[in-house]
């Protein structure tokens, strides 16, 4: 939040090393909003005091009220608060800097191997015919390529990319494999 003495991830990590578990990090327990701080803990050798919230709205409210010091917030939800000086961004977990906040360094630029993004995909039930999958894939590919749509989403801080069915399946599996160790670590992975 804007009242923290940290201006970047290096400041944050130094403070966390000096006084372990003194810095509150808000997230929805068992979700990627908590996982990002667990990844940072592992990458930097620090520990935060984790505080659970039901979702982005509650986390944002807690950040703005100075009830927590850290929160993972997507750019679309946070950009107006960052630009108004009500929230302070410490780093971007995207692989590259974001056009909307071009001066904000990525976590990698700050020395932390931390790439994290909440991504959305469209899926169909198992057994859906190839013709139906291809039909929807074609529609989605067209929408993702539409300049007006991409521009409108970009202004909201939402990055649009398109992956076909096979590429998305591979990407989904790689993402699952990346998050599985963290899910096991916090006890949210249950084997059937």
Question: Which residue stretches match the model-derived regions?
Answer:
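Hinge/capping helix and adjacent helix->loop/strand transition within the periplasmic-binding protein
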Residues: 1-58, 105, 117-152
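Conserved functional loop/turn residues at catalytic and ligand-binding sites
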Residues: 8, 52, 66-67, 74, ...
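Alpha-to-beta junction loops
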Residues: 19-23, 46, 64-73, 86-89, ...
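Short helices/loops that flank or line small-molecule/ion binding pockets
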Residues: 39-43, 57-68, 76-84, 172
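Short beta-strand and adjacent tight-turn residues that come in two discontinuous sequence segments
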Residues: 53, 72-74, 92, 163
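C-terminal lobe and pocket-closing loops
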Residues: 78-147, 174-177, 191
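Mature extracytoplasmic/periplasmic domains
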Residues: 134, 145, 149-170
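Extracellular/periplasmic bilobal clamshell ligand-binding domains
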Residues: 164-192
């Amino acid at each position: 939040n804007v009242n923290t003495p940290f201006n970047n991830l290096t400041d944050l990590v130094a403070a966390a090393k000096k006084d372990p578990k003194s810095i509150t990090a808000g997230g929805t327990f068992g979700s990627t909003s908590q996982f990002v701080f667990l990844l940072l803990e592992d990458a930097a050798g620090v520990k935060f005091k984790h505080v659970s919230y039901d979702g982005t709205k509650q986390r944002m409210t807690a950040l703005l009220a100075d009830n927590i010091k850290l929160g993972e917030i997507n750019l679309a939800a946070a950009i107006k608060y960052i630009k108004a000086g009500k929230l302070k961004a410490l780093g971007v977990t995207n692989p590259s800097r974001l056009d909307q906040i071009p001066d904000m360094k990525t976590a990698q630029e700050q020395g932390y191997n931390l790439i994290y993004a909440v991504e959305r995909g469209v899926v169909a039930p198992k057994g859906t015919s190839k013709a139906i999958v291809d039909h929807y894939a074609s529609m989605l590919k067209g929408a993702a390529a539409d300049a007006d749509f991409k521009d409108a989403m970009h202004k909201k801080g939402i990055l649009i990319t398109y992956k076909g069915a096979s590429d998305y399946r591979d990407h989904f599996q790689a993402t699952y494999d990346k998050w599985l160790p963290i899910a096991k670590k916090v006890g949210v992975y249950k084997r059937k």
